[in-house]
């Protein structure tokens, strides 16, 4: 049982543990039921930015520990891959997008120029890039609110954020390995 704050450190937590003890001592019969679940088939579509939107791809200057962790996990599962991660911003403006983009860039709100820089997607043949977006992105909404309210950037209409996973697979059947990687759900939470 994992709870925060730790119940064993408070008097109120005693009730939880005494209840657990009582449950264990009464030997309640466990009614096992089989669970059958078949996840829905994943559909991947080619990304098309919205009309009048600009795309920023942000790379880290330093090593991305999350990408290294994902790469190590995939390699432990037997996949010979290299993994990198980038942040994807889709910025929709009402007019004069170059001036609006300059304001957004100057704000430092979407990326920290001391640690990150604007980049491009990799273009190697063995690399595939996958854009993953959250269904409800609170972080992106906070950035949008900050840009429109705090920095008074009125021409910003919409902001979308995602993570781009770049997976390089060398010397193998790319499609079958890629589908096996997707089946691990390590890149996203379905």
Where are these regions (language model features)?
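Core nucleic-acid recognition elements
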Residues: 34-190
């Amino acid at each position: 049982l994992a709870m925060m704050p730790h119940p064993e450190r408070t008097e109120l937590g005693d009730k939880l543990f005494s209840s657990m003890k009582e449950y264990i001592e009464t030997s309640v019969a466990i009614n096992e039921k089989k669970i059958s679940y078949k996840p829905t088939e994943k559909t991947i579509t080619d990304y098309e930015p919205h009309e009048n939107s600009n795309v920023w791809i942000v790379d880290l200057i330093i090593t991305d520990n999350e990408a290294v962790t994902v790469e190590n996990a995939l390699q432990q599962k037997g996949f010979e891959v290299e993994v990198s991660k980038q942040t994807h911003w889709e910025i929709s403006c009402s007019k004069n997008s170059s001036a609006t983009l300059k304001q957004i860039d100057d704000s430092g709100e979407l990326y920290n120029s001391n640690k990150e820089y604007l980049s491009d997607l990799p273009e190697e043949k063995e690399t595939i890039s996958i854009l993953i977006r959250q269904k409800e992105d609170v972080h992106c909404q906070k950035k949008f609110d900050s840009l429109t309210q705090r920095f008074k950037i009125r021409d910003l209409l919409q902001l979308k954020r995602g993570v781009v996973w770049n997976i390089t697979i060398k010397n193998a059947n790319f499609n079958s390995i890629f589908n096996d990687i997707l089946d691990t759900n390590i890149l996203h939470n379905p």
